[in-house]
Swiss-Prot record:
Assigned protein family: Belongs to the major facilitator superfamily.
Record has Glycoprotein as a keyword: yes
Membrane topology: Multi-pass membrane protein
Segments crossing the lipid bilayer: 26-46, 64-84, 93-113, 125-145, 154-174, 181-201, 220-240, 251-271, 294-314, 327-347, 356-376, 385-405, 420-440, 492-512
GO annotation, cellular component aspect: plasma membrane
Lineage per the UniProt record: Eukaryota, Fungi, Dikarya, Ascomycota, Pezizomycotina
Keywords: Glycoprotein, Membrane, Transmembrane, Transmembrane helix, Transport
Official protein name in the record: MFS efflux transporter aclA
Matching InterPro entries: MFS (IPR011701), MFS_dom (IPR020846), MFS_trans_sf (IPR036259)
Localization (cell): Membrane
Keyword Signal: no
Amino acid sequence: MDQPSPSAEDSQPERQSTGTRGTRFWAVFVSLCFASFVASLDITAITTALPTVTRELDGGENYVWIANSYTLASAVVQPLIGQISNIVGRRNPMIILMCLFALGSGICGGATSTGMMIAGRTVQGLGAGGILLLLEVIVCDLVPLRERAQYVGIALSTCALGISLGPLVGGALVQHATWRWVFYINLPCAGVALVALVLCLNVQHKREVSWGRALARVDWVGNTIFIAAICAIMYALVIGGSVHPWSSYQVLVPLVLGAFGWVLFHIFEASPYCLEPTMPPRLFRNRTSMTAYVLAFLAAMLMQWVVYFLTLFFQTVKGQSTTMSGVDVIPFTGFMIPSAIVGGAIMSKTGVYRPLHWAGFALLSICMGVFSTWDAGTPRAEWVILQCLVGLGHGLLLTSVLPAIQAALPESDNAAATSAYAFLRSFGFVWGVEIPAVVFNGQVDRFISRVHDATVRNKLAHGGAYSLAGTSFLSQLGDEADAVRSTYTDSLRTVWQVGMAFALLGFALVVVEKHIELRTTLETDFGLEGSENRAATSVEGVETGPVSKAQ
């Protein structure tokens, strides 16, 4: 049965009024939104700068690590951060994570080698992943489930704004200054965000009697197994097909070990030896939350898929500069903002989420199918309209998946459920670069024979085609330019077709979900500090009875 599980009897969380939002709520909310904007800006700013960064640091096929180290780091620590925030509260982890993000940005800006860049991106990812996770956790602490999509929609719209401006900012800085300022620009922004968090983020939590007791509650064994397993899997995926053949032991050994570790992690989490699991098995014991987790993974993967490879399309097939390629993807990234807000408002008003999921994946399927027909002659009106539609689809999914997960779970599981959701979303971001990169590199190697110049062929082969993207490369090719452009065009065609298949899978999986009534009351241990209101009210401010169960 898909219904909310009962909360622990010994817990008496605060039942907060939701009729009005006071000054303290908005101070917390705005500071969180600004912090998430700063962290989100760097997610896509690297997309337009990546070919230049890879070329200047002589990264070659390691360009996927520059992108993936950020998303991998942000993914693997999210369950740990979620659990720590449950134990020590939300405030201190959020402040530390913002400091980590700033430190990573400084390392990236001063990078003199690919290894240093990857290290900096890893530190950045640790901070940004935790910031975006705690943004949603804290909003869930302050807002009941029925309203949650609306407020999460507004909060994530600031993320979408950062994502929208990222390619433009990254391209402009690369073209008119230096790629290093793509990272240095984060430092003053992070400083402002840090001050806002210190002054405004005052939320309560149950304090342990000592730090030793608090640290003893952390699932260190489970998190160690989890992080090692995910890192092994991603290492195999990144080097597979580019550095080593998929059948080689260098790929198979970490892949098998990672898969074994993933299974071992879940066995340990379900065992009596794990007293406080990072990712409790009960999160996955009903079909609605389990399906919604898969949808979250697919939606995130396809979002990254579109962002990275639309930029590549404009730089190579359309011959745009890095700055203009950032401008050209604004219809996609920018349209997610109003779409996310509208989707959240629809869910808050109607209390339904399945139609939004169907509409979102239907739009992704159609648009990615049409993307596969694009070439150098595709008119501007077509690619603008299609990007708006795919942005609409992503926006609808952005705010509607998490409430579907939480609807079947008690409020006490909010942090754990949100952490698992954030991990799968971040893991999806990693796959959203890796899968299309593998497809793209394989297709380039397949079509590269049409290029007659052996020197050019060698530069394009084995992952080199991505790092060479940009008009400066194509303008130097002379008679070979058309052959190289057609290689990019046909390779991207297959990338979009594979993406369409994943979007269709998401559309089909919505059938498995079940409608569950969204709660209109809020019970939490992590409300605003100093709150004394313990009256349970509905969204409209009228007292309600017990939490509604599934229909």
